[in-house]
Amino acid sequence: MKSNADLQKDVQEAIKWEPLLSVAEIGVTAKDGVITLTGTVDSYWKKTEAEEAAKNVAGVKAVVEKIEIKFANNSFKKDDNDIAREVLTAYQWNVEVPRDKVKVKVEKGWVTLEGELEWNFQKEAAKDAVRDLLGVVGVTNNIKIKADTQDEIERKDIETALERNWSLSDREINVKVSGTKVTLTGKVDSWYQKTEAGRIAWKAPGVWSVENDLVVDYAYELAD
């Protein structure tokens, strides 16, 4: 059981624990399990790291991210064409991103990714390769998953994989399969568990989409 103040402190400590993040840069407020992050950082990577750190704190049901990016000096500001070239170069060195499968658009530092890939881990790798680049202020990942395999998705295999995971073994997660789509419903204790369940479902052969409708239902106590 956590109060708003306790949850706020835990999130602040989680952010502080990240070596390149500073609590002084990021403001944290907590209300009924919803965390709001504000402040200014000098890279997109820091922005996403702060959000991930907050999501993984026990008791967090949702994160509202309002962090702004302001580069420390003009040397970090890059032309959109330069950013696009750096993204494509990053993909050439990344074995998880199939060559010439991802289309890149850059507008005022905001990168949009499009195309079709076979696996979700490839889609995530494409996004992760971009977030570390200087000059990037945001990423929209519109890559679609279209697996080549024609295997029928086995609901039981996904359920077994979820039960094998130490953080999910005692959770009641319902799995529904409709064609190439998997839907997860039920309740979990943390944002981490919700994300982990979705990641596991994506690994099933033949999956084109995962609708993660799991509800984070943490026992929450308001402060007096």
Where are these regions (language model features)?
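N-terminal targeting leaders
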Residues: 1-224
